[in-house]
């Protein structure tokens, strides 16, 4: 967790104190190609490039230029996708980002300014990623959009139908630094499948399963 698109623009971090640097998308693609056969992409594989939310989370702690961050993130994703295509990839999937305003972190510890900035970043990113999918199109190459924003909104609105009873709270509570600072005691619910979110930011296994089903149904 904690990875961003490009650490030169926004450094991704992990750990309780968010002090452990983690590899970005650029590094991950580079390492994959370095170890791949003949340092080329597998033409039979599906390459899913999914990043962007952490650029906002970590970037907004040091800068208010959120739209520039969104532009830089999508430019990086587009560059890495093109690199894979140029080296033999035939099927590439880019993803939109979900509404961070729905996460327990923003619901319980955010404010109107944070929500407004998050929404502006999300709209800009998702607009740009759709344009990137169009720009990357080539004959005999499949470049597709997995619209995680749309899928997650659909799941949120129909949560009860999927057996999800709790959408605003985290299944696992009190384990983050933010929660500790707010006096939240450590607690794990008995049935995480009834929750939309596992922790302050990440969906539960059940929510991930529903997202995967939506991607498969929409694209494959």
Region spans (language model):
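A structural motif corresponding to the C-terminal end of an alpha-helix
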Residues: 39-40, 80-91, 124-145
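Conserved SGNH/GDSL esterase-like catalytic core that processes O-acyl groups on lipids
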Residues: 1-75, 79
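Mobile gating loops/cap/lid regions near enzyme active sites that modulate substrate access
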Residues: 99-119, 123, 131, 135, ...
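C-terminal alpha-helix
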Residues: 214-219
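Short, conserved phosphate/pyrophosphate- and ester-handling motifs at nucleotide-, phospho-/glycolipid
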Residues: 204
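Extracellular/periplasmic catalytic domains that process cell-envelope and extracellular macromolecules
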Residues: 38-43, 47, 86-87, 138, ...
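Structural recognition of the beta-strand scaffold that forms the well-ordered cores
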Residues: 1, 45-50, 55-58, 85, ...
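Stable alpha-helical elements in mature extracytoplasmic
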Residues: 24-28, 73-80, 85, 118-121, ...
